[in-house]
From Swiss-Prot:
Lineage per the UniProt record: Eukaryota, Amoebozoa, Evosea, Eumycetozoa, Dictyostelia
Domain of life: Eukaryota
Protein name, entry field: Iron-sulfur cluster assembly factor IBA57 homolog, mitochondrial
GO BP term, pick one: iron-sulfur cluster assembly
Subcellular location: Mitochondrion matrix
Residues annotated as transit peptide in the record: 1-74
Length: 408
């Protein structure tokens, strides 16, 4: 059970992210190596030369299915500090011309991620090092931040040799910190103005914004990145050069709209505000965000309600008067007994995962009224109702050109 009283008035907090692991990729060929394995363009990090910048990425299999997601940043120790000599050749201790990156990943797949990076090392002059024990990762959740510039606290943290960066997926996820172990006590003192919360709170907020993370939600080797909104979370550069698994992602993007996407959902509770009530900054990104509660009533009132099991089918209907009737080939088919109705279709809507009544669901886009989410009705197989929440990336989705050509 989660303590509702502890969440009702939270506007900002700091969260130690203990479920993250860090891999350093360093050497003359570090950029080349990572550039050939990731969905995003790391040249932007190299050209920017700022440790205030990070990039969201996916690492793919050769068939284009996602292995794991990551946040990659420049190694502050190398780019702004005094890098330790790393020998790339016998007798060499010259660090000139070296690049060094920190790859931030889900701890549960550290071993697999290390193996994947080493598998394609070939003759690249790089070292791949687990540096998890050297750092602590923190997130500052605060909807009012749009940049880390001109903030005295963050300037001081940088003097403490911390990497301070906006979360690259969306500004609503606030600020990420990479804190060297020998600076942890000092940094915790500087962050004392923020209430410290457990990582469960971070994950609850992240899920409510429609942001998947980690192997539990991304299902290693099984999913198409764009169905999990990599394009809407700044995780793909469609104009970079070739990389492992590129063909499927590029073809899905350039052929047309995908049919399914991940959406945030919450167990429905009556007599709370409309699901279409959003932060103005989500509706219109040009407007500055207001200081507001991290968790609105529609989430607080649903906490601790039982959500559907992972990978269970959902029944989804768009009740908008303007919504065209589905073609008969797409109509759901009921299977099973009358007492236990299961609904399936060619592209099944399903609940992916959740915590405390909030979760992620894979839904057919044609069933979602993205301009008025209240017109989307969702039930699980036991007829419990779920509400589709307004994700942080909704403005990007509504701006996409709706074309009749779609791909699965």
């Amino acid at each position: 059970m989660i303590n509702l009283k502890s969440l009702e008035k939270i506007k900002k907090c700091v969260v130690p992210l203990k479920s993250r692991s860090l891999i350093k990729v360093v050497g003359p060929d570090a950029l080349k190596h990572l550039q050939g394995l990731t969905t995003n363009n790391l040249n932007r990090l190299k050209d920017n030369q700022s440790t205030n910048t990070s990039i969201y990425n996916g690492f793919l299999q050769g068939n284009g299915r996602l292995l794991f997601d990551s946040i990659i940043s420049l190694d502050r120790e190398h780019h702004n500090g005094n890098p330790k000599p790393i020998s790339m050749a016998p007798g060499s201790s010259d660090n000139s011309g070296l690049d060094s990156f920190i790859v931030d990943i889900d701890s549960s797949i550290l071993e697999e991620a290390m193996a994947h990076l080493k598998q394609y090392k070939l003759r690249n002059k790089i070292d791949i090092i687990d540096v998890t024990e050297n750092f602590n990762v923190y997130s500052i959740l605060d909807k009012t931040y749009k940049t880390v510039r001109d903030d005295s606290l963050f300037a001081q943290l940088e003097k403490d040799q911390c990497s301070v960066m906006m979360d690259p997926r969306h500004q609503i996820m606030g600020v990420r910190l990479l804190v060297p172990n020998n600076k942890q006590l000092v940094v915790e003192e500087r962050l004392s103005k923020y209430e410290s919360k457990d990582e469960t709170i971070y994950n609850l907020f992240r899920l409510s914004q429609g942001i998947p993370q980690g192997v539990k939600e991304y299902q290693w080797g099984n999913i198409i990145p764009l169905e999990y909104n990599f394009d809407l979370l700044n995780g793909v550069d469609f104009h970079k050069g070739c990389y492992l698994g590129q063909e499927l992602t590029s073809r899905t993007h350039f052929t047309g709209l995908i049919r399914k996407r991940i959406f945030p959902v919450v167990m429905s509770v009556k007599d709370v505000e409309s699901a279409s009530v959003m932060d103005e900054a989500i509706i219109d990104p040009t407007k500055p965000p207001k200081e507001s509660l991290l968790f609105p009533k529609r989430i607080l009132n649903a906490l601790n309600l039982e959500h559907p099991p992972s990978d269970s089918a959902l029944i989804v209907k768009n009740i908008s008067p303007k919504h065209n009737q589905q073609q008969s080939s797409d109509e759901p088919v009921k299977v099973g007994t009358d007492s236990e109705i299961k609904t399936v279709s060619r592209s099944t809507d399903k609940f992916i995962t959740g915590i405390h009544g909030v979760g992620l669901a894979m839904l057919k886009v044609e069933n979602i009224d993205i301009f008025q989410l209240d017109n989307t009705v969702v039930h699980d197989k036991s007829n419990k109702e779920l509400t589709v929440l307004p994700p942080c990336w909704i403005s990007k989705l509504t701006s996409l050109q709706m074309t009749p050509q779609q791909v699965s």
